[in-house]
């Protein structure tokens, strides 16, 4: 019986469909729970929300390490000092992300998030000697087009123009801060040789004090404001969504590594592109996101853009691999 159980467990851990489904489910769960947490009337505890998520994340991965499920490096003051600027960028990125998600619908947020890819691509050209192929450029055009169509669709719906203008400001700020975070982290990872869970551990551990300090000094901790952010009828649901979103962040990291291990980087990149569609549609399903010709069209254009970009990156990777033997000869 024990042998049968171990065989069944091994079969599950090597299941490509299960790994793909788990990755998609974790991504959707995190987006939806984040949106729910910040969707309260006049919610203004963004720093506290992010601190709770970080604490949950650290608690969970530390527990998993104790159970020998995952491994990551022990805390090192020298490495922490070098990594601290990355943690500051992370705080800016996740704060602007939570503010954008607070004011924008999930489909709009997901579509505009694609613009970060363009900034990262050209950042890699400048700092890492990367290149942008014609196919990748075509995907960028589709990304910009999907964002323009989504914005036009939003402006034609009477849902509070001021809020959406503020949301776009936070969204563009998030795109630039996300690109900066990814590019600087990539450079630092090359120097430190950090693995996925090393990165998650240091990012969360170093950002928690910053987030708690920002929350205590800039957010209103009066009894009236706490009651406003955590109404009696939804208080426990909001707290649960904070905890679940922190857990799903760990889930995304774990399922990403799992997906790459049992499939391939090509399949993983395709899944990442295809996953944009269910995430955007979840906003239409669970929240009152505007539904019209333009909003639906923008989702599918953004979906196509992600797919074209994934294909472009894989094609570029194959071309680079074919050129390597030539360079050596």
Swiss-Prot record:
One of its GO terms (cellular component) is Golgi membrane. The keyword Transmembrane helix applies. Coiled coil: none annotated. The keyword Transport applies. It is a multi-pass membrane protein. It is found in: Golgi apparatus membrane; Cytoplasmic vesicle membrane; Endoplasmic reticulum membrane. Residues 33-40, 105-107, 153-163, 218-237, 288-290 are lumenal. The chain crosses the membrane at residues 12-32, 41-61, 84-104, 108-128, 132-152, 164-184, 197-217, 238-258, 267-287, 291-311. GO terms for biological process: transmembrane transport. Keywords: Cytoplasmic vesicle, Endoplasmic reticulum, Golgi apparatus, Membrane, Sugar transport, Transmembrane, Transmembrane helix, Transport. Residues 1-11, 62-83, 129-131, 185-196, 259-266, 312-329 are cytoplasmic. Homooligomer. Belongs to the TPT transporter family. SLC35D subfamily. Involved in the import of GDP-mannose from the cytoplasm into the Golgi lumen. This is GDP-mannose transporter. It comes from Komagataella pastoris.
